[in-house]
Amino acid sequence: MNSKTPTLGIVCSEGTISLSLEEGFEFVGVPLSGEGLKLRVEALAPSERLQEFLDDEVAYHPEENVHKVVGLSSAWLELDSEDTLIADRSEEVLLKEASYASYCGLSSIILNGPTSPMNVMRYARAVSSALNSTMNLKFLVQLAIESGHEDYFETWKMWDTIRSACGYHPRLKVALELPPACSPPIELVNRWYAEPIEMITMSCMAFVPNPNGYPVLGRKLRAIYALYLRLNPRILLWDNDAPEKIGDSPDYSIYMKHLFDSQPPAPLVEDLADSYKDYLQVPLQPLSYNLENITYEIFERDPVKYAQYEQAIFSALMDRDESSVTRIAVVGAGRGPLVDCALRAAISSSRTVDMIALEKNPNAFSMLLMRNRQDWAGKVTLVFGDMRTWNPDYKIDILVSELLGSMGDNELSPECLDGVQHVLDEETGICIPSSYISYVTPIMSPKLWSEARNMNDPNAFERQYVVLMNSFDFLAADDEFRFQSLWSFHHPNKDSEVYTKNLHNKRFASVRFQASSPGILHGFAGYFEATLYKDISLSIMPATMEAKSPDMFSWFPIYMPIKKPMYVPENSQLEFHMWRLTDGMRVWFEWCANAYLVLRNGSQIKLSSTEVHNISGKAFSCNMY
């Protein structure tokens, strides 16, 4: 787990705020109004307006712990009532309570969710009105993780309607309730994981006494709770009489924190890059910009990647004649980590090597000069310049590079290696890596889509982003077809065609995915697999990364958004088209998607389509020079 421990709170009255905090809870949920308000509202004539709160109707007053208080909207409100008067009165009260919560300085207010799908749009409009009536207040819609009906996704569908009607408002969040007897399918658990869960709410009755009388969660609830802890939500307990039945109030706090501490460690990439979760970054353009020292430093922290490279070079050396001298060139050497790998591999393989390092970044080249003097005893031949214009009077046996982007080719590795392969020995020369494949899968991520929208840039949805994805869910069925390959590149390129304007590196792919449960398409995630040498590989593709290169963190996936979220019904199909295009001076990617409902007779009905994104590279392209 990451270092953030869960924040635990409990529902209480205004008079017991201090006691609850003293018992170990870090925040409290407090009703904003009392029964008196309900009685007055019920007594109002249809033509009367609700005036300001009366003294006996206010259940909370600002005090020193206001920063530890979450407001609870009145439980009796019926924003989705079929009775227009009741719905209107409920909205009046909500607006009053929201205004009062803002006045008190509260950061958030919890609303009970809609009671059924029938009038959810009425509920959504009222919430939208409340959101727009305040400046900073967060609105947390409390919804059970499952509906309890035949359609497990009913509650999630209601939330999606509310969220969409409110325009993905940044202050609209979920307070997800985990009922005592809930048993949602894993698809639903994962779907909620992608949503903006600000808080987990649980009844104290969800706990059962262990043999020592202390409150614990059952196995299923414990597993769900453990998963959602990765989102760092606050935990709110309610049912104030339950502590008398199972232990004391502090026992809940102790147990919940014990659950956190007993979780298995988070993947290394999450531990090292926690601050990068769901943070959109534009991919590097190493051909047109010189990387900074900190960028090299971050790349060099990945022991897995360099261990794989070293093993690949070692294996390649072992396959060569023991008495020969092998000429190895590291192109794009940066600060020299691959040079270190090659020199170590030469020692462990007992092979003699002639080592060359080429780098075009003058700042990094100065580091290579220093390292050659201090670390390599002058054994490395250093070359300054662009690898594509390098013309040595000798041939290279092993050409080593680390030019891969998050989808393999997206940082122009093909263009670079095509441009330098003329230095390879035509008979025995090899490249490390020797090939790489790009993969893609459809994802649902309100968080990532909102991050792109919040850039307030008209081109934001037509760019690719590098991102450590956390708040997302896969839309494709969990089978062998969840991740589809788009295209591959092989080096050296054996095609004897004369390369003109880089046209041989154009690509097009069209792939389909099956959606087994309802969701919202917010874009596509891109990955790669690379073969370094023979069976030695690198992968950031989720289906193979654990087997090929576990705990590698040099690359985050690519996120390709779509301009407008697309609803994807259960058992529908998503079709994805992608182009890799070039004009000889730059390379860019274009993409679009279609959704289909496939009927039993094999025919299909188109549900929706997107436009082609980044047409002609208008929003983003990679410069070749």
Curated annotation (Swiss-Prot):
It comes from the Eukaryota. Its main location: nucleus. GO terms for cellular component: Cdc42 GTPase complex; cell cortex; cell septum; cell tip; cytosol; lateral cortical node; nucleus. S-adenosyl-L-methionine binds at Y296, K305, Y306, E359, D386, M387. The record marks F299 as: Critical for specifying symmetric addition of methyl groups. It is an enzyme of class 2 (transferase). It holds the Pfam family PRMT5_C. Interacts with the N-terminal regulatory domain of shk1. Shk1, cdc42 and skb1 are able to form a ternary complex in vivo. Interacts with orb6. Interacts with Cdr1 and the Cdr1 inhibitory target Wee1. This is Protein arginine N-methyltransferase skb1.
